[in-house]
Amino acid sequence: MLVRHAKAVSDSGGSDRARELTDSGRKDAARVGSWLSGRLSSADAAWSSSAVRARQTFEAIAERLSFPVRVDLRDDLYDAGPDDLLELVREADDSVAVLVVVGHNPTIERLQAWLSDDDRGFPAGAVAILEFEGPWADLDPGDARLVAFTVP
């Protein structure tokens, strides 16, 4: 599952990594969490960019889920391009059936388009649920099927 962080403030007065969600971004992420609660029964692993806005998006979503999810905050997701993110996903343990990745555009949008051959755009707060059969290490562009997509 790929998640683009929800709408963030345009200027934090500090670093880009410190930008927080706007009030509407928080509400959007909570709405997405409610939408996901009816579609997911578990998540084996969750990765989020260490940027504040991505972490806040994950937290707002996780609060609405009916199961606990522990997140791994990853610095490498902040600057990752689509090739980099695909390589990281390929390194996921095969015991992970459901992987949640919260990140940034253009990376999330491009990876979703590569994996599913569906280039629909990826607005702030959007979520794509993809299915893939096989070991993570074998995941290549065009191998996944987009089964659900929502925009808050």
Predicted regions and their residues:
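Glycine-rich phosphate-binding loop signature in dinucleotide/nucleotide-binding domains
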Residues: 39-42, 92-97
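Domain-level recognition of soluble alpha/beta enzyme cores
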Residues: 118-152
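Short, flexible active-site-adjacent loop segments at beta-strand->alpha-helix junctions, enriched
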Residues: 6-7, 52, 77, 105-107, ...
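Active-site-proximal alpha-helix that buttresses catalytic centers in soluble enzyme cores
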Residues: 1-76, 80-84, 119-122
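A glycine-rich beta-strand to alpha-helix segment
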Residues: 96-114
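Short, surface-exposed amphipathic charged segments that create phosphate/polyanion-binding patches used
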Residues: 86-92
